[in-house]
Amino acid sequence: VIVCAIMLLLLTAYATWLVSRYARPGLWLTVVFAIIGVFAFITWSAAGGLVPVTGLLFGALSLSVPLVFGALGGVIGERVGVVNVAIEAQFLFAAFSSALIASVTGSFFLGLLGAVVAGALVGSVLAVFSIKYLVDQVIVGVVLNVLITGLTSFLHGAILQPHTETLNSPERFPRWPIPFLSDIPIIGPVVFNQTLIVYLMYFIVPLVAWGLYRTRWGLRLRAVGEHPTAADTVGIKVNPTRFWNVLLAGGIAGIGGAYF
């Protein structure tokens, strides 16, 4: 632990030196700092005992999946100029819809599609009120969170609980191990023996990062969010661009809701 603390202090001093020279610390510095910090914490907490590292990493990854999808939805909304505070509402409505559709159809894939549509529907309400009627985006998001929380609680008690066997018994996502990769010690069972939603996360995160900064879609999206007047001047339709991207953000957040 002392060695890790010394290394963290050295990294902090190096980052401070870079900032003092008006240089930007690289991403590698943050990653190394985080790894050493986590290792130091595990070493300290497990002093004199055993820590199941694989189980710890598996639990951390499982808890992070919905947060990642929610963050992706928030990033897209923020970049296009709409503050998406209704991510919790998209999670809840997507989780409810996914469970109901998967139970009725017996297909986890249709349940996932239902979650995407449900998240997009909540996003459409946010888009209509904030873009067309110019209602404060934060207020709309908070109202949607309260509304969907109450609505899903009511529907759960009125529909799902009385018919648990038929309407609240969705098929679970199976785990699909990737050949060879899932056999890697420690990392393999955690990263490469997961469900469809986790694999979608592996795919969507770099796709969104690439799309935002390497495609015409991302350029238009960021232009609308950063300077809508200039974007409108060069012929970009600001409101439709915002509307469809808020729907896209809601659909992505809905995938995180299906994970619940």
Located regions from the model:
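Membrane-interfacial amphipathic/re-entrant helices at transmembrane-helix boundaries
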Residues: 1-69, 109
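Hydrophobic core segments of alpha-helical transmembrane domains in multi-pass membrane transport
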Residues: 6-16, 33-42, 149-153, 200-209, ...
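Alpha-helical transmembrane segments and their helix-start/interface "positive-inside/aromatic belt" motifs
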Residues: 23-30, 132-146
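Hydrophobic alpha-helical transmembrane segments
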Residues: 30, 60, 89-92, 109-117, ...
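Single transmembrane alpha-helix segments in multi-pass membrane proteins
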Residues: 55-104, 110-112, 121-138
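Structural signal for membrane-spanning alpha-helices in multi-pass inner-membrane proteins
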Residues: 70, 74, 98-102, 127, ...
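Transmembrane helix-bundle core of multi-pass membrane transporters
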Residues: 149-213, 244
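Helix-loop-helix "hairpin" substructures at the membrane interface of multi-pass membrane proteins
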Residues: 190-260
